[in-house]
Amino acid sequence: MMYIRRLNDQTANQIAAGEVVERPASVVKELIENSIDAHASCIRVDILQGGAKQIRIQDDGDGIHPEDLVLALERHATSKIAKIDDLQDVTTLGFRGEALASISAVSRLTLTSRQKNAEMGYRISNISHKIMTPVPAAHPQGTTIDVQDLFYNTPARRKFLRSPATEFQHIRRIIERLALSHFTTEFLLHHNEKEIIHFKSATTISGQENRIKSILGDVFMQSALAIEFSQSGLTLKGYIAEAAYTRSQPDLQYIYVNGRFVRDKLIAQALRQAYHDVLFHGRHPAYVLYLEIDPAFVDINVHPTKHEVRFRDPQWVRDFLIHAVKTALAQTKPGIAHPLPQSTAEYNPITNFAPTPLIEGQGNLSLIQEQPAPYTQTIVHKHPLGHALAQLQGIYILSQNEKGLVIVDMHAAHERILYEKMKKQLAEVGLVMQSLLVPINLSLNPQEITAWQTNKALFARLGFEIESFGPDKIVVRRHPSLLKPKNLENLIRDVLADLITHNTTSRVGERINAVLATLACHAALRAPHYLTIEEMEALLREMEKTEHGGLCNHGRPTWKQFDIAELDTFFLRGQ
């Protein structure tokens, strides 16, 4: 028979340590956060053998009073909070009072500290799970914590450690994450007595950008858009990569809530949704973002590692993030290297839109608002995408701008233009409908019938008039005027297929945009389709004023620039 018994302190501490101390990087994170909370301006980290042998953290912070040294190594002892209500306003990185106790339970730990204006420092050690009496020790202002032989007394945990090189990479990533949210703090990292990282204090914008560049890379910063967006008590700052810069893995995604690095599914999904219209399948956006919110509206006491948060109103935060990032992404236009100025939080990327007819797929381009000026060398610079020269095999448009040659994918560009116009028309007046001379009868399978019955209102809003015609048939009487009747049956089946596979819990707006993307893809010009110079010119001008005109609805690029210098190098000119 199993009897309930009380665990001794040593066993309880080692079990608790398993929640906080997963690997050497966990130790580094907890100790650096303590240094930051102590207002350290410089933090040095020394690592031996990936942290399994030694982790040494030294800072120049406030230091610890000698009388508090013993308490510092005990569980549930903290200077950050005094009562449960204090959790509503926590602004420090640490507050649980568990880190030092958990670390000392699975290592040989020595803590030395001296406060400002104190005559000397004091040292305390945890030997054989016994906290020794503090003794005087020479030490500069600040605190040094020496952690040796991590998991020496828990062999099961120690054998799960990876190689020293792997463990060190985890430590490096922890320091980089902390360095990205505490720019005024200097960070030094040494491994096996070799300096690996030295982030100097960054008090200027250029200094902060240099630190970001050293961590996320030059290519990220070259494609980065600065964002600063405030609304309804929320503020989002930082940098997001242009839609053309994506990653095969979500490895360059840094999000901070009130200065704390978090991994939050709600935030990650919101940011991905903001990129939805421009993200190629299987690719991931890159960003470093800082969300500021009233501490009373977010709970950071969700998990011992404090990587997870819980918002009081998650939908409010989600909508804000999507709107903020979409607005920033909308600032760039084809051929423009830097974001356009953002005037207000309600910035509308499409302004002064002339109510000209929309493009009709596989028909004449109805883009031309006026006869374009004949091409001359003197006006090339006026248009980022230049002026049309010719068309290649009914697929690509060749254009010349002041930089050199531009090649445009006709279908991809037309698809994006149609998609953005559809969204705008739907939001303003709804999609215009047109009657079919001969209604189309469609036989559907059970899944398709269910999808249509569930989404009748959606089809009506998209400009379709469809009626039931028996248990497994429908009849299409009217369709959006944007679309040609040709292949209308295939289009409706594709839309139904999208709705069948689409998450039924998704919000209506997202579902509508997904269907509009399918409509635009079907309506866009398809190769081979030959255009006149005037039609090509009209397409280029529309691209320049279309939101996300540099990418199609699936995230593929719509155009490519070839600079004269690049061509000269290829043809060995001047060599």
Curated annotation (Swiss-Prot):
Organism domain of life: Bacteria
GO biological process, one term: mismatch repair
Entry-linked InterPro entries: DNA_mismatch_repair_CS (IPR014762), DNA_mismatch_repair_MutL (IPR020667), DNA_mismatch_S5_2-like (IPR013507), HATPase_C_sf (IPR036890), MutL/Mlh/PMS (IPR002099), MutL/Mlh/Pms-like (IPR038973), MutL_C (IPR014790), MutL_C_dimsub (IPR042120)
Cited CDD domains: HATPase_MutL-MLH-PMS-like, MutL_Trans_MutL
One cellular-component annotation, GO: mismatch repair complex
Oxidoreductase in keyword set: no
Entries under PROSITE patterns matching the protein: DNA_MISMATCH_REPAIR_1 (PS00058)
Protein name per Swiss-Prot or TrEMBL: DNA mismatch repair protein MutL
Protein keywords: DNA damage, DNA repair
Gene source species: Coxiella burnetii (strain CbuG_Q212) (Coxiella burnetii (strain Q212))
Keyword Isomerase among UniProt keywords: no
Gene: mutL
GO molecular function list: ATP binding; ATP hydrolysis activity; ATP-dependent DNA damage sensor activity; mismatched DNA binding
Function statement: This protein is involved in the repair of mismatches in DNA. It is required for dam-dependent methyl-directed DNA mismatch repair. May act as a 'molecular matchmaker', a protein that promotes the formation of a stable complex between two or more DNA-binding proteins in an ATP-dependent manner without itself being part of a final effector complex.
Protein family according to the UniProt entry: Belongs to the DNA mismatch repair MutL/HexB family.
